């Protein structure tokens, strides 16, 4: 019988390590299963459906393999002139909404960072509140603001009875205003984080050299904050392409809603139940988002270097 204490200690450590590994696998396994069931499988199945003729509403399709039709859904989407109008409308929304969020968010962050005054922390907290609200609630709230009869928006601006929710000339701008109001604080927070991380000695050295405010802004502030601004731009661009709940709260799903891709995808997939067509449109949107964000990520990697 071997009573070597070192060998016993090594055996105990090996057993304990094996036990910890087993426990780790037991705890991680349910998460992996849920990830596969809730994400990977729907992603794969929707890709299969995009190459088929299938409607989830037809009870005759239940348990039946979908009829494969190749790239017909994709060809139909890309050859539809109305679909290109929706692409253009979505691009307008993204450019307007994200552009205003970046400008306003960074501008407010600059003011809060440079100007010292009593109650700045309280004001910052108030400015953050919109992004903590549910998007559907934000949409309904702005729908009440936009009401042409009793809404406060037209009353405060003295614009008369403009219907920002149903008028096709204004409903897109109505959604832009609500989205900018809600998500400008997100850009502001990231900008404040970037501005706070700029070393103070750089500004002190610039002061000694009697550098102008523009030199300090363009050569010190912007290069240091630029990576975080790109992060904000990436996240907001992705979310703007997929916007749905704010639009639903403001305009509903009817014909009065702005002709955005996300709203059309909802109507196709869950109102008319053209499941395969909706899946193909969803993957086209996914490719667009990946392509655009890849460009931003490329610039982000350059900025880090």
Which residues are covered by each model-predicted region?
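Short, Lys/Arg-rich, polar N-terminal cytosolic tail immediately upstream
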Residues: 1-19
